[in-house]
UniProtKB/Swiss-Prot annotation:
GO terms for biological process: translation. GO terms for molecular function: structural constituent of ribosome. SUPFAM superfamilies: Ribosomal protein S16. Belongs to the bacterial ribosomal protein bS16 family. GO terms for cellular component: cytoplasm; small ribosomal subunit. The gene is rpsP. It comes from Mesoplasma florum (strain ATCC 33453 / NBRC 100688 / NCTC 11704 / L1) (Acholeplasma florum). InterPro entries: Ribosomal_bS16, Ribosomal_bS16_CS, Ribosomal_bS16_dom_sf. HAMAP family: Ribosomal_bS16. This is Small ribosomal subunit protein bS16. Keywords: Ribonucleoprotein, Ribosomal protein.
Length: 89
């Protein structure tokens, strides 16, 4: 199963994360399939490629709780919901 999750790359006491699509069996900081965005919790700065995130979500990738909140803040989850409603019509 593919998950959209955070990969930590910052230094000690200075966390910085990449938002990645990765196989759920790979460890947190292991290989990933594709880079979707970044998250800096110290500056509360989130950069997400909305098109890539939507592509992975539509293909069945499961976001972790934290990533789901970040995607919601950026409007990606709303766009996914609207796309699903449009497909039903």
């Amino acid at each position: 199963m593919v998950k959209i999750r955070l990969k930590r790359i910052g230094k000690k006491q200075a966390p910085f994360y990449r938002i990645v699509a990765a196989d759920s069996r790979v460890n947190r900081n292991g290989q990933y399939i594709e880079l979707i965005g970044t998250f800096d919790p110290l500056k509360s700065e989130v950069k997400i490629n909305n098109e890539l995130a939507l592509k992975w979500l539509q293909n069945g990738a499961q976001p972790t709780e934290t990533v789901r909140e970040l995607l919601s803040q950026q409007g990606v989850m709303k766009a996914l919901h609207e796309a699903k409603l449009a497909n039903k019509k």
